[in-house]
Every structure is written in structure tokens, then in C-alpha cells.
Amino acid sequence: MKKNIGLVLMVAGMVSLAACGSESNKNEVGSAADQAEVVIGLDDTFVPMGFRDKDGELTGFDIELSQAIFDLTDTKVTYQPIDWAMKEAELDNGTIDMIWNGYSKTTEREEKVLFSDTYMENLQLLVTSKSSGITEFSAMAGKKLGAQEGSSGYNTFNNEPEVLKDMVDGNDATLYASFNEAFIDLENGRIDGLLIDRVYAEYYLTSTGKLEEYN
């Protein structure tokens, strides 16, 4: 697998953090830095942004960045693992104060939440096994596609059906709670391609020594 892995499906947007769900919350909320404690919702399997190390401790780029920022204001941070498909609902319900975990900024999501300034570019990729021979989107015709439920990749898959949805098996994707589960199925041939964030795919395949096995 080359450094620029996968087929680039679309630009999913810039990675940001988000806070405040409903209109009423938007009018009431102040700066998070003014709070004594904040609860951050995250997918704790999303490498390298927020995940658990071999000792079960949370680590990753977004974990360290958020800790560094809130240390400046002596704000206590609690990290709350959530169902990624329910992240905006968790925000609206007030069970978390913000989402900070590789959360891509999209037009659709901007209608639901308030975003911070963006701090990283992210792409959505179609990753396939080299043994599958799939090196272009058209080769996914009749094939099984996987995606994470609630991900920006799956949202765009539905919003731009002419790219992949209209041709894949069942005109839909097999949905997973985490990319970890999706990669297991990809590796075992239960799906033929996976829609995934570039930052996750590059880290996962490099750290597992499988970079050369995938397109």
C-alpha cells in the first residue's frame, strides 16, 4: 500500500470539536473554559485521535490536545465513551458537553452543532485488500461495502449515491459500531471495501504492519 492509501472518495471536511446541540443550548452555553468541569464524548477506539493503550488508559492526539488546553484554565476534564451513532443526541441531552474525537466538520453536522475552528484536514477513503483486485470505484459494483454508523463517510455515501451507493451490493453498506470491527470483517473477506477516515486507516495499517496488503 502506498503512503496515500485508498481511493479518495470525497473531502469529508476539516476535523474540529463541537459543542451545544439544540438552539436553546446554543443560546445558554458559555465558554467551556468558564466551566469547572467538562465532559467530552468520544469513540474510544478511534486511533490515533482517542483510544485505549495496552494498559487500558485513554490516549491519542485529541486526548492530549484537550488536556493541554483545559490545563490552562484548571478545568477538570472527564472523557465519556459514547455510541458514535448517537453522538449528537448525547450532546442535545446534555450527557456530554462536547464532542472532541476526530469529528469532521460537514454542512449537515453544522445544522446540529456549533463547531470550533478546524485544526486538521481529513479525507474519506475506500480501502480494499490488494488480493481483491479492486482499485477503482466501478469495481465495487455488486460488492459488499462497510462503514461506521454515524460517520461522515456514511453520511456522504447516502448524500452522493452516484459515487458508490447505486452500485454496491444491496445499495447500502454494512454498518459497524467501530472501525476496529469493520477492519476485522475486511481482513476476513466478509466485506470487500471499507469507507474510512484517512487518519484512522494510515495509523491502523502502519501500526499493525499491514500497510502493503491494502489498496
Task: Enumerate the predicted regions with their spans.
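C-terminal motif of bacterial Sec signal peptides marking the signal peptidase cleavage site
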Residues: 15-19
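Bacterial signal peptide processing site
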Residues: 21-23
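Extracytoplasmic small-molecule ligand-binding "clamshell" domains
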Residues: 27-102, 175
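Acidic, polar ligand-binding/catalytic clefts
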Residues: 67, 76-139
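Short loop->beta-strand "edge-of-pocket" segments that line small-molecule binding or catalytic clefts
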Residues: 38-42, 138-155
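Short helices/loops that flank or line small-molecule/ion binding pockets
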Residues: 72, 80-81, 85-98, 112, ...
